[in-house]
A protein has these predicted regions:
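Primary detection of the long, small/polar-rich alpha-helical "axial" segments characteristic
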Residues: 1-292
Length: 292
C-alpha cells in the first residue's frame, strides 16, 4: 500500500536511531570517565552496591590512619621511657659507685648532685612528654580505651575498624617519680633519695632497681600494644584492598567491552541513518504514479 501521510519505515528508523544513540552515549560516557556505572540508570543495583563498598573502603582507610596515629602515640611514649630508663641506669651506676668505701662523703656529695639532677629530669620528662598536645606519662592516660566507634570517653579514641564494637584497650601508666615510688619530695638534701652517704646509697639502690623494673614492664606493655596495632593496620589494609578490587569489578569500565560497544553503536547509527534516508525516499514513488 502506497501512502504519504504516515511513513512507517521512517518511524522505525528514527526509533532505532534514538535507541542506538542512547547506547552510544552510554559507551562514550563510560570510556570518558572510566566508570561503568555513572548513574542509577546504568545499573541501579550495581550503583547501590558500589556506593556501599565505597563507604566501607573509605572507613577502612581512615581506620588505618587512626591506628597508625595510635602507634605513633605509643612510640612517642616509649621513646620518652627509653630516656628515663637510661637516666635510671646512670643513677644506679652512681648509687653503686657511692657504695664503694674508697670514696669520702664529700666525693659522694658530688655524685649525689648528678643523681638528684637526673631524678628531677626523669620527672620533667614524664610531665612534659605529649602527643597531639595530650600528656602521655603523667597519669592522664591510665586505662585508655581506643574505641573504633569514636564515642569513647577516654582521652584518646581511635577508630580501628569500620564497624562499632571493635575496641582495642591499652594501659599507659604514669612514669613520674611518684608513680615509680621515688617521691619528688625525697630528691633534696634532706630527702631519702640521695647517695651522699654510704648508708643512703645502699637504700637508694634498691629503690632505683624497682623503678627500672617498672619502666621495663611499661616498655614491654607498650611494645605489645604497638605490635597488636600494627597487625590490626595490616589486616585493615588487606580488607580495604580486597574491597577496592571488588568495587572495581562492579563500578569500573571494561575498556575492551566498552570500545566494542562503541564501535557497534557507531556502525548501527550509520546504517540507521542510511535506512532513514531510504525510507524518506519511499513517498517519492507516489509522485511517479501521479505523473504516470
Amino acid at each position: 500500500m502506497s501512502v504519504i501521510n504516515t511513513n512507517v519505515s521512517a518511524l522505525y528508523s528514527q526509533n532505532a536511531m534514538k535507541t542506538n544513540a542512547r547506547a552510544m552515549s552510554t559507551a562514550m560516557e563510560q570510556l570518558s570517565t572510566g566508570t561503568r556505572v555513572n548513574s542509577a540508570k546504568d545499573d541501579a543495583a550495581g550503583l547501590a552496591i558500589g556506593q556501599n563498598m565505597t563507604s566501607q573502603i573509605r572507613g577502612l582507610q581512615q581506620a588505618v590512619r587512626n591506628v597508625n596515629d595510635g602507634i605513633n602515640m605509643l612510640q612517642t611514649a616509649e621513646g620518652a621511657m627509653v630516656e628515663q630508663s637510661n637516666m635510671l641506669q646512670r643513677m644506679r651506676e652512681l648509687a653503686v659507685q657511692a657504695m664503694n668505701g674508697t670514696y669520702s662523703d664529700v666525693q659522694r656529695g658530688y655524685m649525689n648532685s648528678e643523681f638528684q639532677a637526673l631524678g628531677l629530669q626523669i620527672n620533667r620528662i614524664a610531665t612534659d612528654t605529649k602527643w597531639n598536645d595530650q600528656s602521655l606519662l603523667n597519669g592522664e592516660l591510665d586505662s585508655t580505651t581506643l574505641d573504633p566507634t569514636g564515642a569513647g570517653s577516654a582521652t584518646f579514641t581511635f577508630q580501628a575498624g569500620k564497624d562499632a564494637g571493635q575496641v582495642v584497650s591499652i594501659d599507659i601508666k604514669a612514669t613520674t617519680l611518684t608513680s615509680l615510688d621515688l617521691p619528688l619530695s625525697a630528691f633534696n638534701d634532706d630527702g631519702d633519695m640521695q647517695i651522699g652517704t654510704l648508708a643512703t646509697a645502699t637504700i637508694t639502690l634498691t629503690a632505683i632497681e624497682t623503678a627500672l623494673e617498672t619502666i621495663n614492664e611499661q616498655r614491654a606493655n607498650i611494645g605489645a600494644a604497638v605490635n597488636r596495632l600494627a597487625y590490626t593496620a595490616d589486616n585493615l589494609t588487606n580488607i580495604a584492598s580486597n574491597a577496592t578490587q571488588s568495587r572495581s569489578t562492579i563500578m569500573d569500565t571494561d575498556y575492551a567491552l566498552a570500545t566494542t560497544q562503541l564501535a557497534k553503536t557507531q556502525i548501527i547509527q550509520q546504517a540507521a541513518t542510511a535506512m532513514l534516508a531510504q525510507a524518506n525516499q519511499q513517498p517519492q514513488g507516489v509522485m511517479a504514479l501521479l505523473k504516470g
